[in-house]
């Protein structure tokens, strides 16, 4: 599919390096440097998931860790499944496979979406704390469907085949956030002779300077 919502130039992506990825069984194209969210938006994908309880359609709302809607399942095989990954924080790579965590038979045509139209009357806030209490022996059955309605991702049922790097290190000053303020604070602390570690959720430093 063409990237119908992609600007012809600008941004910090490499348009010479095209990457293929799959979302909900449909193959799309993006560029190196895209986040998964950016690539989905560029391809005109606006429904990413469904809301809790009422199953109303939800799209990408934010740009980072604060994203409330685009929480996806990542992984091409059972062993590599990663639940609850925010599309705004996931870098695009060749062969990435992502799926919505709810919506049946699919996220665009969710049968539970009817609750979004009548749910306010039939399901007032907190109704499940009263409705599903009896008989007590049925709770495990109720719980299975309530969890599915919550839209939570699932953990893999096979062992993770990947290995991970780790490091134990010590410092005098830990600075969280590598934007302009964090970098300035780190420079000042380092000039005083302190051992400084800068931690940031992004792949590179700079924040709003980039």
Q: What spans do the regions from the language model cover?
A:
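N-terminal glycine-rich anion-binding loops that anchor highly charged ligand groups
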Residues: 13-15, 198-203
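Conserved active-site and cofactor/substrate-binding residues in soluble primary-metabolism enzymes
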Residues: 31, 35, 184, 191, ...
